[in-house]
Amino acid sequence: MAILKAEERTDSRRSSLRRIRQSGYVPGVIYGRNLENKSVALDSIELLKILRAEGKNTIINLDINGDQHSVMVTELQTDPLKDSIVHADFKVVDMEAEMEATVPVNLTGEAEGIKQGGVLQQPLYELSVTAKPKNIPQTIEVDISSLEVNDVLTVGDIPTKGDYSYNHEPDEVVASILPPQKQEETEAESAAQDVEEPEKGTEEEKEE
């Protein structure tokens, strides 16, 4: 478990937050059951190292002036222009109790349907899971190599290894392979012609 040192802070004025960020630290909040919310400041580089190496759902041992808590990051506020973290929220977790978390879905492999000109559609980029903190995956890897045109991958198709469960209906669509656009257009045009032709025949009969 990664250890991250933090200092409790009492000054929440904007000028104070600005000074914290300018010094290379990140303001944050730690909260949880049986714990009064605490405002903290921590090293931004160390936090980034942990998240990049172990993922957002990793358990961190947050050391606040010698008082240690097992926490997970629940929210990160970032500055897209500077590619930096400007605020972090940490939740104290019970290592033996199940909790909910969102996990990114990583599709791997090249689907057969894409090789045939199909188009990949991915409605779900994250899945909500329930598990003990140590069993929450950092990513859910799904091999889509076997998917062909018109195939659909649902939540129920993705195994869980038994140590976590999905908070979704089994038939929720994670990914699908749509037919090539030209094929769809041709089928649509053909269907339109089939509808128009009987109408023309009816008009000729009326004229007779």
Curated annotation (Swiss-Prot):
Basic and acidic residues bias (residue ranges): 198-208
Gene Ontology CC, one term: cytosolic large ribosomal subunit
Keywords from the named record: Ribonucleoprotein, Ribosomal protein, RNA-binding, rRNA-binding
Location of region: Disordered: 163-208
SUPFAM superfamilies associated with the record: Ribosomal protein L25-like
One GO molecular-function entry: 5S rRNA binding
Superkingdom of source: Bacteria
Pfam families in UniProt: Ribosomal_L25p, Ribosomal_TL5_C
InterPro entries named in the record: Rbsml_bL25/Gln-tRNA_synth_N, Ribosomal_bL25/Gln-tRNA_synth, Ribosomal_bL25_b-dom, Ribosomal_bL25_C, Ribosomal_bL25_long, Ribosomal_L25_dom, Ribosomal_uL5_bac-type
Keyword rRNA-binding: yes
A GO biological-process term: translation
Family, as annotated: Belongs to the bacterial ribosomal protein bL25 family. CTC subfamily.
PANTHER family: RIBOSOMAL PROTEIN L25/GLN-TRNA SYNTHETASE, ANTI-CODON-BINDING DOMAIN-CONTAINING PROTEIN, RIBOSOMAL PROTEIN L25_GLN-TRNA SYNTHETASE, ANTI-CODON-BINDING DOMAIN-CONTAINING PROTEIN
Subunit structure: Part of the 50S ribosomal subunit; part of the 5S rRNA/L5/L18/L25 subcomplex. Contacts the 5S rRNA. Binds to the 5S rRNA independently of L5 and L18.
Role, per record: This is one of the proteins that binds to the 5S RNA in the ribosome where it forms part of the central protuberance.
Protein name: Large ribosomal subunit protein bL25
UniProt source species: Bacillus licheniformis (strain ATCC 14580 / DSM 13 / JCM 2505 / CCUG 7422 / NBRC 12200 / NCIMB 9375 / NCTC 10341 / NRRL NRS-1264 / Gibson 46)
The gene coding this protein: rplY
